[in-house]
Curated annotation (Swiss-Prot):
Subcellular location: Cytoplasm
Renumbered residue ranges of the record's region Disordered: 1-22
Protein's name in the database: Probable rho GDP-dissociation inhibitor
Species of provenance: Caenorhabditis elegans
Keyword set includes Cytoplasm: yes
Biased composition (Polar residues): 8-21
Recorded GO CC terms: cytosol; membrane
Stated role: Regulates the GDP/GTP exchange reaction of the Rho proteins by inhibiting the dissociation of GDP from them, and the subsequent binding of GTP to them.
Keywords, sorted A to Z: Cytoplasm, GTPase activation
GO molecular function terms noted in the UniProt entry: GTPase activator activity; Rho GDP-dissociation inhibitor activity
Gene: rhi-1
Protein family membership: Belongs to the Rho GDI family.
């Protein structure tokens, strides 16, 4: 399965059933008699519950997103306060034909997060022109910031593609928990 997929239609014949979620403590306490497995799990999962922000009940706290154009940071947005994003005017300009990608910085706290996804729907003049879903992966809680970079994309080019696009973005997981939901504007420019 690729890292990103077009979510326009579901062609899968199989329905994947996710195994039940286990807490970090349950995972650490399983197979206690196997010393090498105990060391491996402690290295992978840490020593127990990690809490970065006690006031925030979410398992994933998205801190920022950066737009990287041709490998260099072009713009960065602070996403750490979702309330400030409601009426904000986040706007990005990309030169047509440029290679770009998004880089997310986030914390994972409390429990393992399985199947973290970044989804976006892009509209122009009210018509959906793109609907994508990127698999970010599964993450164990850590005090350190974790990062995900989307695959490289090429901005559309040509007179018909220049202009203003509205992007509706969302970060979710396999359990359909929504960690962040925001909108931004993308301008494809000639220069």
């Amino acid at each position: 399965m690729s890292d990103h997929e077009n979510t326009g239609e579901n062609t899968s014949e199989y329905q994947y059933k996710q195994p039940p979620q286990k807490s970090i403590d349950e995972l650490l306490n399983a197979d206690k008699e196997d010393e090498s497995l105990k060391v491996y799990k402690a290295k992978l999962l840490g020593q127990g519950t990690v809490i970065v922000d006690e006031k925030n009940p979410l398992r994933v706290i998205v801190r920022s997103v950066e737009l990287l154009i041709n490998g260099k940071t072009a713009q960065s947005f602070d996403l750490s306060d979702p309330a400030k994003l409601v009426n904000s005017d986040l706007s990005v300009s990309i030169k047509e034909g440029s290679n770009y990608r998004l880089s997310f910085a986030f914390h994972v706290q409390r429990e393992i997060t399985s199947g973290l996804h970044y989804k976006h729907k892009v509209k122009r003049s009210g018509i959906t022109v793109e609907n994508e879903k990127y698999m970010m992966g599964s993450y164990a809680p850590k005090l350190e910031i974790q990062e995900y970079k989307s695959p490289n994309e090429e901005a559309p080019s040509g007179m018909m593609h220049r202009g203003k696009y509205k992007v509706y973005s969302k970060i979710t997981d396999d359990d359909n928990n929504v960690y962040l939901d925001w909108q931004w504007t993308l301008h494809i420019t000639k220069e």
